[in-house]
């Protein structure tokens, strides 16, 4: 290959890379999140400058309930919502053109970083003891609510005989202590605080019945935004991937990052059970949620997993 042509191709490659970074730098990204450690990889990406290094100006904004995130994305008050997959699928099923940008927390067999916590003075011996109880969930139709109902079904319990009410993570300890609910489905670090305070006890992590790993949180945005900002999407995905690798091997980094975005006593952060993180959103993971939700009659339309993942 002639040398001038080689130099020209190198120059074009460099210029394209610089242009992509510059384009991304012009884009402000506001991410809505809820008070759970499943967002640790995103927190790490922000605190370690992984977004900034790629020319992104990212801000994380606390939202009380996960079920509120699609509306916030649609209104433009946030760019991405850290939606649970079940919330994203319901939004798409309802007609919103939203797509998954990147992943965050994932489930795995034997996981205990989230679960159902029964109030200390309420008896519990078996899954059917939830019948007639009032259970607080951080978003009706969100991850914990849907996965817990799936566990009830697999244990022969009609979830329609359980009353569910929405309770934000920050209010769970007080609502449970006050006797307003019998149990909550929750995650770390809130779960650890409730248990450590003697307010309740974890009775199940409701993952022993799962056949495969499932994504918990996906950063989702409008299809229109993703298609108009491919450089920013790629930069965001790369930053989350680097942060997930850090989160999966550095517990101290996870605890420090969670402490910065979820205000809890230091002893709660130090003792919280940690999860796992995965940046890639897979068709198999989305399809697994479609199956679980169809079993609960939560979807009106057929959803093709590959159509809601930003490429």
Regions of interest found by a model, annotated:
Residues 53, 108-109, 208-211, 276-285, ...:
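Short, solvent-exposed loop/beta-turn-alpha elements that line the ligand-binding surface or hinge
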Residues 226-298:
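Secondary-structure end/capping motifs
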Residues 294-311:
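Conserved C-terminal helix/tail region of periplasmic/extracytoplasmic solute-binding proteins
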Residues 45-48, 54, 72, 76, ...:
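Structured segments of extracytoplasmic/periplasmic soluble domains
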